[in-house]
Structure formats: C-alpha cells, structure tokens
C-alpha cells in the first residue's frame, strides 16, 4: 500500500490537520455533493440546503467523530482492516451503508485537505492520501465481502 517514505509523509502531515474543522467540512460536503447520503443522517435535523448542512452542529460533530476514527487509522496504516473491523461491522450489519459511500467520503476528504492546505498539499502528498483513503474505504467495506 504505502512505502515507508509515504507513511512518514502522511503521518507528519496529519499532525497539522484540525480534525474538528476538516471532519465537519468533509462530511458536510459529502451530504451536499451526494445528497442521497443524507438518508443515513435523517436524525440530524435540517439538511435542506447546502448552508443548512454546512452549519448543522450535528454534521460538524459527526464529522469530527469520523475523522477521530480516521486519525486512529493513521496510527495503524499496516492494519487498516483490523483497525476498522468493528466500524465495518456496524456500517454493514446495523446501518446498511452502501460501501461506495466510504470511497466518496475519502475523495471528499482529499478535496477538503487540498482546500485547507493549498500548495502545502502537494500532488505527491495527494497521491499518498489517495492511497490512504482507498485503504480505509476498503477496510470499512471489508465486512460486505
């Protein structure tokens, strides 16, 4: 998946990420760009407009929770399937989330990182993070296979 150099790069960069800001924005953008994903968050209240989604405190809080889990995965890049096994089971067996949504969220996360960090988020770092989000999405989808 990742070389030692790539792991070092993504891990060092992740230390700069403000999980609460980036998580809320990433989940919010997922819900705006891919509105069918909103069906999993009906209890979050008003998701009727982009502004409502992006300013919804429940979206922000859950986005932080998602990125807290992602942060844990960043500490276990060699065992993503093991790290995300319980979440895979939850999302498959109880929540019935389409595993394609994990890929969508990963791609949105990469967009948000690029937006927040600009030139510091180099093409090489983007490529490395694309590998990470793909690995996390595959780990979360593991229970479905």
UniProtKB/Swiss-Prot annotation:
PANTHER family: HEMOGLOBIN FAMILY MEMBER, HEMOGLOBIN SUBUNIT BETA. Red blood cells. Residues 1-145 form the Globin domain. Heme b binds at residues 62, 91. Keywords: Acetylation, Heme, Iron, Metal-binding, Oxygen transport, Phosphoprotein, S-nitrosylation, Transport. Belongs to the globin family. The modification N6-acetyllysine is found at residues 58, 81. Involved in oxygen transport from the lung to the various peripheral tissues. GO terms for molecular function: haptoglobin binding; heme binding; hemoglobin alpha binding; metal ion binding; organic acid binding; oxygen binding; oxygen carrier activity; peroxidase activity. It comes from Tragelaphus strepsiceros (Greater kudu). This is Hemoglobin subunit beta. The modification Phosphothreonine is found at residue 11. One of its GO terms (biological process) is hydrogen peroxide catabolic process. InterPro entries: Globin (IPR000971), Globin-like_sf (IPR009050), Globin/Proto (IPR012292), Hemoglobin_b (IPR002337), Hemoglobin_oxygen_transport (IPR050056). The modification S-nitrosocysteine is found at residue 92. PROSITE patterns: GLOBIN (PS01033). The keyword Acetylation applies. One of its GO terms (cellular component) is hemoglobin complex. The modification Phosphoserine is found at residue 43. Heterotetramer of two alpha chains and two beta chains. Pfam families: Globin.
């Amino acid at each position: 998946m990742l070389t030692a150099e790539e792991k070092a790069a993504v891990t060092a960069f992740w230390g700069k990420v403000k999980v609460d800001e980036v998580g809320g924005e990433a989940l919010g953008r997922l819900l705006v760009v891919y509105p069918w994903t909103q069906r999993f968050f009906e209890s979050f209240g008003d998701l009727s407009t982009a502004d409502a989604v992006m300013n919804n405190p429940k979206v922000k809080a859950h986005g932080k929770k998602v990125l807290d889990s992602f942060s844990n995965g960043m500490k276990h890049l060699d065992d993503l399937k093991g790290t995300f096994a319980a979440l895979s089971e939850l999302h498959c067996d109880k929540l019935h989330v389409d595993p394609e949504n994990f890929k969508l969220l990963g791609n949105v996360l990469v967009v948000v990182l690029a937006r927040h960090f600009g030139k510091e988020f180099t093409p090489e770092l983007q490529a490395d993070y694309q590998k990470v989000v793909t690995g996390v999405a595959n780990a979360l989808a593991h229970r479905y296979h």
